[in-house]
Amino acid sequence: MGIEGLLEKGFVTTTIDTVVNWGRTGSLWPMTFGLACCAVEMMHAGAARYDLDRFGIVFRPSPRQSDVMIVAGTLVNKMAPALRKVYDQMPEPRWVVSMGSCANGGGYYHYSYSIVRGCDRIVPVDIYVPGCPPTAEALLFGLVQLQKKIRRTNTIAR
């Protein structure tokens, strides 16, 4: 938790930023935006073998209930406005994980006329998970990296 000091009477001293970020890292609620085969690996990560619940990661069906969006798969031009609309409906603070080669940069379909060459052209991306499709372990590693990134951010303006 980043405890700075411990007093004799059982008090813990720390900063508000540390407490808020600790709470945020332990309760990530991702909304799935599964577009292709990467979504199957995302479902695999949420199943019993990897069990994202033990990390405080609980999948939510609504953008208004989630603070992380996992974009998994090929993003086509017709779907790009819907992605942005869903992103705008998420409450602040919000984070985006781009999962797979297609979401990262177009992947196998990079030169197709109807493909967005990376979801970072539509929404700001915090973590990129490589692979085609990436394994459940890679997604889990990406989410742990997102938790580390959240711990390092300042929440209170100085």
Swiss-Prot record:
Keywords from the named record: 4Fe-4S, Cell inner membrane, Cell membrane, Iron, Iron-sulfur, Membrane, Metal-binding, NAD, Quinone, Translocase, Transport, Ubiquinone
A cellular component annotation (GO) from this entry: plasma membrane
Membrane topology category: Peripheral membrane protein
Gene Ontology molecular function terms on file: 4 iron, 4 sulfur cluster binding; iron ion binding; NADH dehydrogenase (ubiquinone) activity; NADH:ubiquinone reductase (non-electrogenic) activity; quinone binding
Alphabetical list of Gene3D superfamilies matching this protein: 3.40.50.12280
GO BP annotation list: aerobic respiration; electron transport coupled proton transport
Broad class of where this protein is predominantly found: membrane
Subcellular location: Cell inner membrane
Superkingdom assignment: Bacteria
Pfam families in alphabetical order: Oxidored_q6
Reactions this protein catalyses: a quinone + NADH + 5 H(+)(in) = a quinol + NAD(+) + 4 H(+)(out)
InterPro entries: NADH_UbQ_OxRdtase-like_20kDa, NADH_UQ_OxRdtase_20Kd_su
Binding-site residues for [4Fe-4S] cluster, renumbered to this chain: C37, C38, C102, C132
Documented EC number(s): 7.1.1.-
Quaternary context: NDH-1 is composed of 14 different subunits. Subunits NuoB, C, D, E, F, and G constitute the peripheral sector of the complex.
Family: Belongs to the complex I 20 kDa subunit family.
Protein's name according to its UniProt entry: NADH-quinone oxidoreductase subunit B 2
Organism lineage: Bacteria, Pseudomonadati, Pseudomonadota, Acidithiobacillia, Acidithiobacillales
Gene name of the record: nuoB2
